[in-house]
Curated annotation (Swiss-Prot):
<dbReference type="GO" id="GO:0005576">
    <property type="term" value="C:extracellular region"/>
</dbReference>
<comment type="similarity">
    <text>Belongs to the neurotoxin 12 (Hwtx-2) family. 01 (Ap1a) subfamily.</text>
</comment>
<dbReference type="GO" id="GO:0090729">
    <property type="term" value="F:toxin activity"/>
</dbReference>
<comment type="function">
    <text>Is toxic to both insects and mammals. Induces reversible paralysis when injected into S.frugiperda larvae. Reduces both the amplitude and frequency of responses from muscle (GF-TTM and GF-DLM) pathways in the D.melanogaster giant fiber circuit, suggesting an action at the neuromuscular junction, which is mediated by glutamatergic receptors. In mice, intracranial injection of 30 ug causes increased urination, myoclonus, hypermotility with circular movements followed by respiratory and generalized seizures resulting in death within 25-35 minutes of injection.</text>
</comment>
<keyword id="KW-0800">Toxin</keyword>
<feature type="disulfide bond">
    <location>
        <begin position="4"/>
        <end position="34"/>
    </location>
</feature>
<keyword id="KW-1015">Disulfide bond</keyword>
<protein>
    <recommendedName>
        <fullName>U1-theraphotoxin-Agm1a</fullName>
    </recommendedName>
</protein>
<keyword id="KW-0964">Secreted</keyword>
<dbReference type="Pfam" id="PF08089">
    <property type="entry name" value="Toxin_20"/>
</dbReference>
<dbReference type="InterPro" id="IPR012625">
    <property type="entry name" value="Hwtx-2-like"/>
</dbReference>
<feature type="disulfide bond">
    <location>
        <begin position="22"/>
        <end position="45"/>
    </location>
</feature>
<feature type="disulfide bond">
    <location>
        <begin position="8"/>
        <end position="40"/>
    </location>
</feature>
<feature type="modified residue" description="Methionine sulfoxide; partial">
    <location>
        <position position="44"/>
    </location>
</feature>
<keyword id="KW-0528">Neurotoxin</keyword>
<keyword id="KW-0558">Oxidation</keyword>
């Protein structure tokens, strides 16, 4: 099993900054979302 962790990232001044973890919006929405121009990116994946 591989488990992945996602975090929100934004690019400012050509540098990407990492923010809070991504949260699914609502129970039905499986897509993880970030607000205010932040993008959800895979932080790391671990093999369990």
């Amino acid at each position: 099993i591989i488990e992945c962790f996602f975090s929100c990232e934004i690019e400012k001044d050509g540098k990407s900054k990492e923010g809070k973890p991504c949260k699914p919006k609502g129970d039905k929405d499986k897509d993880k979302k970030c607000s205010g121009g932040w993008r959800c990116k895979i932080k790391m994946c671990l093999k369990i």
